[in-house]
Amino acid sequence: KKVRKNLKSSYFYNLFTNFFGKYKKSYSENFGEDLFVDFFFKEFKKGSYVDVGCNLPKTSSLTYLLYKKGWSGINIDISKRAIDLNKVIRKRDINLNISIGKEEKIIDSFIFYDNCSMNTVDKKFKEYTRKSVNKDPEVVKIEQLKLDSVLRKYNMNKINYLNIDVEGNELNTLNGFSLNKYNPDLVSIEIHDKT
């Protein structure tokens, strides 16, 4: 009913429900991206995902529908509070409070609110967000690892779905990942325009 209310045209409602089905609830923040991901993997009973910049375990999650189907994977976020919530709700998953990048070192993370989807390690994005929310972030030292190192440590040899949502740190994240080695079936990356 909520979807029908938001889609004014019956044509778009019919198109939407024919593509995604009538009774799926979207947990993603914006456009039901998680419904597309779920539809893409409709033939997969089980699988694995890596969610870099996972934020909350349900709300705005692109992997929660997969988790509900029995999938498991690795959730990574710079917000300790977000990872603590993931540990409670997503018990099958590995939940890591780290940053991902091309170099392994201790870096500054910029935390505006505990579960803010705008927390970042990117200095330009920090300034953009600071102006948007009119608040200075808390600067928290955090370990940054290469995604390859994390996957090796947890013996993840196959990734069905890779999601990257890291507020300006996308290229740095990808530079620590061997795409050809892991060859995910589907990759989604939230990219912000110049901030």
Write out the residue ranges for each language-model feature.
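Phosphate/nucleotide-binding beta-alpha loop and adjacent structural elements of enzyme active sites
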Residues: 1-195
